[in-house]
């Protein structure tokens, strides 16, 4: 998966994460892009803590459930023990990504948005290939 990290043209203080439009794009890539774009720092710490093998690390917009070395990204997700009485598994919409790959993308995203103000230029961008997580 390839993502493009860039600073918004209208305000170089706003960073944006978009998927790199290529023939390999999938809905999974789009879910990852949305999740990264709104990921909170405390959720990324939980994601990186490998001693946690099950947890709910959602954002304001999207649910995320860690299950050992996989992360489920989607909507209407619950940990098995937290499912409501009227739980309907057919309402779960999700895509699975390797936890290692998502951690790599989150680290790259945070290093991008934490750049010093003087280095945040409107035309600056980085292309991130998640395959680098496995090298």
Where are these regions (language model features)?
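Intrinsically disordered, low-complexity segments enriched in small/polar residues
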Residues: 11, 29, 33, 54, ...
């Amino acid at each position: 998966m390839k993502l493009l990290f860039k600073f918004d043209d209208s305000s170089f203080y706003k960073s944006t994460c978009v998927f790199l439009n290529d023939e390999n794009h999938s809905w999974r890539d789009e879910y990852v892009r949305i999740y990264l774009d709104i990921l909170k720092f405390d959720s990324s710490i939980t994601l990186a803590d490998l001693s946690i093998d099950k947890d709910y690390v959602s954002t304001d917009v999207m649910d995320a459930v860690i299950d050992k070395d996989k992360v489920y990204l989607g909507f209407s997700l619950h940990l098995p023990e937290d499912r409501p009485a009227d739980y309907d598994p057919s309402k779960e919409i999700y895509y699975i990504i390797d936890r290692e790959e998502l951690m790599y993308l989150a680290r790259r995203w945070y290093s991008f948005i934490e750049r010093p103000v003087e280095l945040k230029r409107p035309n600056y961008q980085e292309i991130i290939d998640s395959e680098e997580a496995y090298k």
